[in-house]
Design a protein with these regions (language model features):
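Short, basic phosphate-binding NTP loop
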Residues: 1-107, 117-122, 146, 270, ...
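Residue-level signal for inorganic ion chemistry
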Residues: 9, 39, 58, 89, ...
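Active-site beta-alpha connecting loops in nucleotide-dependent enzymes
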Residues: 47-49, 312-314, 331-407
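Non-catalytic positions within long, well-ordered alpha-helices that form the structural scaffold/packing
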Residues: 55, 59-60, 171-172, 381
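Acidic, Mg2+-coordinating active-site environments of NTP-dependent enzymes
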Residues: 69-73, 101, 178-326, 378-381, ...
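Phosphate-binding loop of NTP-binding sites
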Residues: 85-219, 225-232, 427, 451-456
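ATP-dependent carboxylate/acyl-activation modules
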Residues: 108, 114, 313-316, 339, ...
Length: 457
């Protein structure tokens, strides 16, 4: 973070300062355990924890200033709403960086693929700041903005939403120069009034562009392509022949895609992705289009994207265990679209070996939940996945559908808990198996994935 004074912070958030006006702030954190000397500690009040209780610990660790919503015995800025104040601070700070240097804001949204595309750009663009993990909400995104400094040329932001207006708020903090919309799917469907509502929410990113900014849109997704009139400049990507940035001569080997990038008719060198899953071709093309808009050359950008590794945890992480069992950990999140993509990746990685899909509930599906899980069970059987293990009552319709579709005997199984899933797998897995673990993060199924990765039977 570029150093700022306590007075500057107070002015930015329209708060009341009770501290040395010239005290210097050099970082912003919301966890007292992450405080370093010079930090601004942001005291959030949560359902179970009140951040104000940790102000003494923050001071002991060297915090210069605290952002609070109640009086504390420490140098502080007092505000009515800490979350809104954090957004205001990030908004003012980005404006300051823009006046002092050349910084390009690249924002990514979409029902699936946001974090992967962000991670690809973080490993491709020079002088870049991007979050690790999925820091894409009203708290995480401002903290990412505040991690940039005067040397930052590219600020990559992930903008998520679970309802209308969320992305519009995030773009009010950090209006993007480059806006990437990956897809309109059914993730968080419970927060919207149907597919059109989801599309309108994702379009908020395009509406939030700076004047003259460019929208990078998926030509393969009709709802995304329809956002083109909202932007002054548009670059498209995808498999469609009309896309500005597309993939030619696509092949797959053990789940990893290889293709020739074509940009407005000009072919680059073949690139083979390190990421597992054909669906990552879309993410790679989006990242490539953004990198080109940021001034990179085709072959340089494509080479860096090809060699990029998974950074954020529990996202298509493939581990080949010493006992001959391969684990695909994609347990961070789940939607119908990402589940289907993960099933295909499972089959590709297995290359004819025995396949085991361990799936949990897709959360935040609202009234569509039962039907979505039912369709998932049908899909698993139709694809020819050998064994389907469904974990948790919320996902049980997937098991019921698999049985109805013809998954007999022990080809499909239902267990009520992660502990039961652990026992089931320990009795059945053998060398040569490829196991996919996937569910929404809130199910906790990632704990099982971690155990499977650590186990070297």
């Amino acid at each position: 973070m570029r150093p700022v004074t306590a007075q500057w912070v107070a002015n930015a958030v329209s708060g009341t300062l009770a501290a040395d006006v010239d005290a210097i702030v050099t970082s912003v954190v919301k966890d007292s355990r992450e405080v370093a000397p010079g930090a601004l500690y942001v005291a959030f009040v949560g359902e179970r924890v009140d951040g104000h209780d940790f102000v003494p610990a923050a001071l002991a660790a060297g915090a210069t200033l605290c952002l609070v919503s109640q009086h504390v015995d420490a140098p502080h800025v007092l505000v009515d709403d800490v979350e809104l104040a954090l957004g205001a601070l990030a908004r003012a700070y980005l404006a300051l960086l823009r006046t002092e240097g050349d910084i390009t804001v690249v924002a990514v949204t979409g029902s699936n693929g946001k974090t992967t595309t962000k991670d690809l750009l973080a490993q491709t663009l020079p002088d870049v700041v991007a979050p690790v993990g999925s820091y894409n909400n009203e708290i995480g995104m401002p903290l990412t903005v505040l991690a940039a400094d005067s040397s930052t040329r590219h600020l990559v932001l992930e903008m998520g939403a679970s309802g209308p207006g969320h992305i519009a708020y995030l773009t009010s903090i950090a209006p993007p120069d480059v806006a990437i919309v990956l897809m309109v799917g059914t993730a968080h469907a419970g927060g919207y009034d149907g597919p059109d509502g989801i599309a309108r929410a994702k379009a908020e990113l395009v509406r939030g562009l700076v004047p003259g900014g460019v929208a990078i849109l998926n030509a393969d997704d009709t709802a995304v392509a329809a956002m083109a009139p909202l932007a002054e400049r548009v670059v498209t990507f995808g498999q469609a022949s009309v896309a500005d940035v597309r993939a030619s001569d696509l092949t797959l080997a053990k789940g990893r895609a290889s293709f020739v990038p074509v940009v407005r008719g000009a072919s680059g060198h073949r690139m083979t992705l390190s990421l597992v899953g054909e669906h990552h071709v879309t993410n790679a093309l989006a990242a490539l289009a953004a990198a080109l808009e940021c001034g990179m050359q085709l072959d340089e950008a494509s080479a860096l994207i090809a060699q990029a590794k998974p950074v954020s945890a529990h996202r298509m992480a493939v581990t080949e265990r010493a006992d001959g069992i391969t684990i695909i950990d994609d347990s961070y999140n789940a939607s119908p679209e990402s589940m289907r993509a993960a099933f295909l990746a499972l089959l590709d990685v297995a290359e004819g070996g025995r396949t085991v899909a361990v799936i949990g509930e897709m959360l935040e599906m609202g009234d569509a939940s039962r039907e979505a899980h039912w369709e998932l069970g049908h899909h698993a059987v139709r694809l020819g996945i050998d064994y389907l293990l469904v974990v948790g009552e919320g996902a049980k319709p997937a098991f019921d559908a698999a049985v109805r579709e013809g998954s007999w005997g022990d080809e499909a199984a239902f267990v009520g808990s992660i502990g039961d899933a652990r026992s089931y797998l320990s009795e059945r897995l053998m060398a040569g198996d490829t196991v996919l673990v996937k569910a929404s993060h809130g199910t906790g199924l990632y704990e099982l994935a971690d155990e499977l990765v650590r186990t070297q039977a």
